[in-house]
Amino acid sequence: AHQLPMGTLCNFYEWYRRDD
C-alpha cells in the first residue's frame, strides 16, 4: 500500500525513490 508522506514535493520525490 502506497502512502504519500504529508510534506513538500521534495518529500514526495524522496518517498517515490525509496519506494523502489
From Swiss-Prot:
Domain of life: Bacteria
pH-dependence of activity, as noted: Optimum pH is 4.5. Stable from pH 4.0-7.5, activity decreases drastically above pH 7.5 and below pH 3.5.
Annotated thermal dependence: Optimum temperature is 70 degrees Celsius. Active from 30 to 75 degrees Celsius, inactivated following 150 minutes incubation at 85 degrees Celsius.
Keywords associated with the record: Carbohydrate metabolism, Glycosidase, Hydrolase
GO terms of molecular function: alpha-amylase activity
Top-rank EC class of the record's enzyme: hydrolase
Reaction catalysed by this enzyme: Endohydrolysis of (1->4)-alpha-D-glucosidic linkages in polysaccharides containing three or more (1->4)-alpha-linked D-glucose units
Activity regulation behaviour: Strongly inhibited by Hg (2+). Inhibited by Zn (2+). Activated by Fe (2+), Mg (2+) and Ba (2+).
Coiled-coil stretches: none
Its EC number(s): 3.2.1.1
Functional summary from the UniProt entry: Alpha-amylase active towards amylose, starch, amylopectin and maltodextrins. Has lower activity towards glycogen, and is not active towards alpha/beta-cyclodextrin.
UniProt protein name: Alpha-amylase
